[in-house]
Amino acid sequence: METRTRLSPNAARLARSGNGDSVGRLGIQALKETAPTSPITPPLPKDRAWVHSRRMKLIGVIPARYASTRFPGKPLHPIAGIPLIQRVVERCRLSPALSEVIVATDDERIAAFARGFCRVEMTRDDHPSGTDRIAEVASRVPADGYINIQGDEPLMDPAVINAVAEALRDSDMSTASTPIRDLAEFDNPNVVKVVTTAGGRALYFSRRTIPYLRDAAQKSLAEQWASYPFQKHLGIYGYRRDTLLRLVGFPVSPLEAAEKLEQLRALENGFSIAVARVEHDSVGVDVPTDVARVEALLASTASVTHCA
């Protein structure tokens, strides 16, 4: 963070009087007032301040599994004529925050196809989570940080990637949230909610609706939903390299096991997670019936940029 230094009123008077000895006796620290250019943003820790001195090298990593329980072979399924994994790569390449995009997979069928337009890193097939798969890539491909992008979101807005990348500059991890706009998502345990500090750091993620509105508890769900700006968590993560490699060394945490949310392992072990608030909502392909819905959305939007 940039600072500017100015003399205190007493020091200024001494300087004008030419009494340099008096100034020296007061001491440099007593004469200087350091005024942050932004009074809200705290100083960066020394081990992290370097990220502001240059552009971070961030790599987008898309974990891709063939053996999906609800939709086997999903990454290769065509979405309006183009396989899903290629759609996701194309969207990621629209983000100027990413230096490179990598598909991380344990399946040779996905790898053989993706090599035609993207770098591929083969990973083990026993990873318990996407975070562990990303960490394996990070152990071989050096960068300042990594953005974990879901492989089933062919409409990913590059502005969300940019926001998560920017939030990572002064945090261990970063992610994104968006307002809950649909009442059907308000009490849905498959829609993860997040609450943050005033400065945008994650306090907690839950499948339950948080915060609990005590004064509105007896009201209808619609009334509760309308009375507070509830935030939906989007499944995109940014990790600093050192954070990622440390994080996967911790065992599954109690809260992670209870909620089945891997980001809680980070919070329980003291890592900070910056949450970028965005307007774009995620539209994923979870089951085969989602394909028609996504294709309709694609048809109603501008043409999609294809890989070079």
Describe each model-derived feature in a short phrase.
Residues 6, 59, 153, 193, ...:
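A residue-level structural signature of the nucleotidyltransferase/glycosyltransferase Rossmann-like core
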Residues 57-104:
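N-terminal glycine-rich phosphate-binding loop and ensuing alpha1 helix
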Residues 105-106, 156, 239, 286:
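A conserved hydrophobic position in a structured secondary element of the catalytic/binding core
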Residues 39, 51-52:
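Short, positively charged and aromatic/hydrophobic N-terminal segments
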Residues 156-253:
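Conserved core of the sugar-phosphate nucleotidyltransferase
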Residues 219-308:
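Conserved alpha/beta core of the MobA/IspD/sugar-nucleotide pyrophosphorylase nucleotidyltransferase superfamily
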Residues 102, 108-166:
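Short phosphate-binding loop-to-helix
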Residues 2-3, 7-14, 21-23, 30-35, ...:
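Short amphipathic, helix-prone segments within low-complexity/disordered or flexible regions
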